[in-house]
Amino acid sequence: MNASVPPSAAEYGGDEVSAIVLDPGFSTTRAGFAGEDTPKSLVPTYYGKYSFEGQEKLIFGDDVFVTPRPSLSVGNPMGRDGVVEDWDMAEKLWEYSFTSRLTGAKPSNPLHNGLNDLVEGELPTEMEGVETNEKPLADSPLLMSECSWNPTKAREKTIEIAMEKWGTPAFYLARNGVLASFAAGKASALVVDIGASNISVTPVHDGMVLKRGVQHSPLGGDYISSQIRALFKTNTPQPITITPHYLISSKTAVEAGQPPQAKYKTFPPEKAPDASYRSLLEERTLTEFKECVVQVWPGPTKLSAPGPNGVPNEEMARSTPGRPFEFPDGYNQVFGVDRYRVVESLFDAKATILDPDSQFPAPTPAQTIPELIKAALNGVDVDLRPHLLANVVVTGASSLLYGFTDRLNQELMQLYPGPRVRISAPGNTSERRFSSWIGGSILASLGTFHQMWISKKEFDEHGPNIVEKRCK
């Protein structure tokens, strides 16, 4: 299929076309073929940069985490608000996500047949000899996801990369909220998405985002990690320092609460990776901690409030069995009421664990999940509200915290005692983590979707602004 001649509409309908679905997030980027259940390619949205023999080299994929190279620094092309900040890196990283697992490398592919290390000077900046080099998506229509507040400039830049750099014959840009509601089998829903860098609440009606109701705040999974760090600083019997695996050569088992007995590796300054590498590796331990230990207080009242029988909730929490966790250096401890504290501020801003060193400012009440939902519903027509409350879709990897949906249900029933509140949150972890991707996979494989694609011909005629008219 030649990239300059768009296929006929029939070739877009359903299975004849191997459309690719690309769902970039702050923590991971998901890519796969339309019609499949889960994305084949899941790569970190982080890249590594280091110098070798005087040349700058780049690393993508899981290799970023594996080897602590000298002066290796780690970056992320996405901003915390979900909008791309570094377009050059975003383009390379997205291209890696589908060429490494899905399409294979084409002759002009800058990733040199999937090998990670690139020499900056060798990357084709102009696409010289476009006719002789096949572009990476010359045979595949591309559906991409975006946040609901993505600005026009970013949307236009995305279609330019897809059409001009990758040579896709057809393109569509879909909003995350709409895709997540399709994945849940709903045309209308209130989508609560707890991602790594932010929380968003998106009202969707008949497959369209109700823009006035869209709300988002920076209290995502990375904010919870910062709350865990703040907790560790004030921990008793001793403050906890996270030492990533690459700095430990051996460890000895110790009793709970006893100082660790480990032998540490040291790197001379010229061989040591950058601080950004260490903090990314610490984040992996924090993610494990969130998965194994952290729990959301089930409610119905806040953790700081008295419970239904007059006993303070914190006392109730203390009486529940704790959860043990072992750190990479062998230090281990059982966590009691503290495991509830680190997420309580998603629902109650006053419960924030303050940390002067945190990159996150203390949240305001308006940034908490109940208030975001309230603001989202206040932004839409009164008649739609009961229908949206009966179709609340919970998605995003950070929504997998133990007890999260129970607490959300309690909060919503208190805010809206009249209408029926129904929460749809798939128990299957991959459905919850990849729901935008799954929605895109469903959408791009529908036969009726073929009239929605923007063809290369239309892009050439109307320019990048066509994305604003066609992808509402």
Curated annotation (Swiss-Prot):
- Cross-referenced Pfam families: Actin
Location within or outside the cell? Nucleus
**Is this entry keyworded NAD?**
no
UniProt keyword list: Activator, Chromatin regulator, DNA damage, DNA repair, Nucleus, Transcription, Transcription regulation
Q: Which Gene3D superfamilies match?
A: 3.30.420.40, Actin, Chain A, domain 4
Q: Name one GO cellular component term.
A: SWI/SNF complex
Q: Which domain of life is it from?
A: Eukaryota
Annotated GO molecular function terms are: chromatin binding
* Cleavable signal peptide: none
Chief location:
nucleus
Physiological role: Chromatin interaction component of the NuA4 histone acetyltransferase complex which is involved in transcriptional activation of selected genes principally by acetylation of nucleosomal histone H4 and H2A. The NuA4 complex is also involved in DNA repair. Is required for NuA4 complex integrity. Component of the SWR1 complex which mediates the ATP-dependent exchange of histone H2A for the H2A variant HZT1 leading to transcriptional regulation of selected genes by chromatin remodeling. Component of the INO80 complex which remodels chromatin by shifting nucleosomes and is involved in DNA repair.
Subunit details? Component of the NuA4 histone acetyltransferase complex, of the INO80 chromatin remodeling complex, and of the SWR1 chromatin remodeling complex.
The protein, known as: Actin-related protein 4
From which organism does this entry originate?
Emericella nidulans (strain FGSC A4 / ATCC 38163 / CBS 112.46 / NRRL 194 / M139) (Aspergillus nidulans)
Q: What is the lineage of its organism?
A: Eukaryota, Fungi, Dikarya, Ascomycota, Pezizomycotina
